[in-house]
Each structure stands twice: as structure tokens, then as C-alpha cells.
Design a protein with these regions (language model features):
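Negatively charged, low-complexity tracts enriched in Asp/Glu with abundant Ser/Thr
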Residues: 1-30, 71-74, 79-114, 157, ...
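Intrinsically disordered, low-complexity regulatory segments enriched in Ser/Thr/Pro
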Residues: 45-88, 128-169
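Amphipathic, interaction-prone secondary-structure segments
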Residues: 18-51, 104-136
Length: 173
């Protein structure tokens, strides 16, 4: 993975978090992420609403979208995420962040701990399957890791405490 300005050597946690925030905004689900030499390829299902008929019937059509995020796109997503979280009026607390922003962040944390050469993963119904290309002294090899939806949700619940963050008190709460 490319080193982004101001980031540690490998920072899948922050990179994947920013990609996840984009996917949340897009309403994407059942996603696949492949790391490429110059960024990431992301594919998933989106439900697009369309209006048709005399009675304006709302029909949702599922489409499969594919995005190629180059290094510059990733850097921009990260900057936008930092700006959003640093802006007190627009700040999104951890509990308000979308599912993919949270899930990709904790999966990214796991990936950072493994220190792979590159990654591939897919998500379906909240469960993740990862294939990491490792660089042990005996030669490169792929390692598979799986996380159930419940495991990912537990990782999300623990993430705030792990980083020393606490849920911000909401006004009127």
C-alpha cells in the first residue's frame, strides 16, 4: 500500500475507514475490495430508486457498481474524513458513523496487525472473508481470515475503547 502523507507506513485502518464512509454514502452493500498497485478496486450492489407509471410507483433496481480508487482518491477521502471528524458542527461520532466506515476500520486494524503485502476481501451480510498476501522469509503466501457478523460487531463495539475514545455525550441525552 502506498504511504499517504502524514500516515504511518501501513495504515489500512484509516484507508479502509475512508473507503467505507464513501460506500455508506453510496448505499452500497455486499462489497468486494481488491488492492491494486495504484489503489483499490471496489465492487458492490446498490439499490437505485426509480419512479415510473402514472401513479409514480417507486421501484428499486439493484445494480452492481465498480469503482477504481486511485491513490489520489484515497488521499482525498482521508482528508475529507479528517475534516469531517475535526469539524465540531459536522463531526460524526463513532456511534453515528455508517456500518462500512466502522466495519472497514476494524478490519483495517486487523490487517495492519498482520502486515500483509496486499489484500483482497469481500463482505456479505456483515461477514468478512479476507485473503492477505504475506511475506514470510520462506516466500510469499496467501493467508485466509474470516469474521462472522457477530465478530465484526464485537470488534466495532470494542474499537472505541481500544483507541481510548468514548462516545461523545449527545445534547439532551
Amino acid at each position: 500500500m502506498r504511504i499517504y502523507d502524514g500516515s504511518p507506513r501501513q495504515n489500512y485502518e484509516e484507508v479502509l475507514r475512508s473507503v467505507g464512509a464513501f460506500l455508506d454514502q453510496r448505499g452500497m452493500r455486499e462489497v468486494m475490495v481488491v488492492e491494486a498497485p495504484d489503489g483499490f478496486v471496489v465492487q458492490g450492489i446498490v439499490v437505485e430508486n426509480s419512479t415510473s407509471g402514472a401513479w409514480s410507483e417507486h421501484l428499486g433496481q439493484q445494480t452492481k457498481d465498480t469503482f477504481t480508487f486511485l491513490d489520489d482518491d484515497i488521499a482525498r477521502f482521508m482528508e475529507e474524513g479528517h475534516a469531517r471528524r475535526d469539524n465540531e458542527q459536522r463531526a460524526v461520532t463513532w456511534g453515528q458513523a455508517g456500518y462500512y466506515e466502522q466495519a472497514f476500520r476494524v478490519v483495517g486494524r486487523y490487517v495492519d496487525e498482520q502486515k500483509p503485502a496486499d489484500i483482497f476481501f469481500f463482505e456479505q451480510d456483515g461477514a468478512f472473508v479476507l485473503r492477505l498476501l504475506m511475506r514470510p522469509q520462506t516466500g510469499r503466501r496467501h493467508v485466509i481470515a474470516e469474521f462472522t457478523r457477530e465478530e465484526v460487531e464485537a470488534m466495532i463495539a470494542q474499537a472505541r475503547d481500544f483507541r481510548g475514545e468514548r462516545t461523545k455525550t449527545q445534547p439532551g441525552a
